[in-house]
Amino acid sequence: MENKKIETIKDAQKLVKFFAERNNWKDIPNVDKFDHLHEELIEMSQHLRYKSEEERIKFVKENKEIFTDGIGDLFFGTCRLANQLGVDIEEAFNLVKTEILAKYNHKNPENNLIKKK
């Protein structure tokens, strides 16, 4: 299972569950997993902080591996957290997608972007 390409969110969550069981880790709620995910986000955001839009785009293009690795770590950790909480990620996504798409179905820009001077 470890060398098989993961093609669905459900398969990813199953692989992470298998990984945890193989290592004798309990799937119980763990505050450390929330902290781990927060750290992963901070690590990636630090590369883009205080840069203009143009600088951020350039940095990501030139350093794609940083973000590919970070997103992979974040997703693996999210699967682990979902397992600990007994949440099916696909069900959770489908539960919120319509509401989020409707809520942000407007032309306003995203928040917290550095504005050009």
Model-derived regions, located:
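Flexible "arm" and connector segments at domain edges
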Residues: 1-71, 75-117
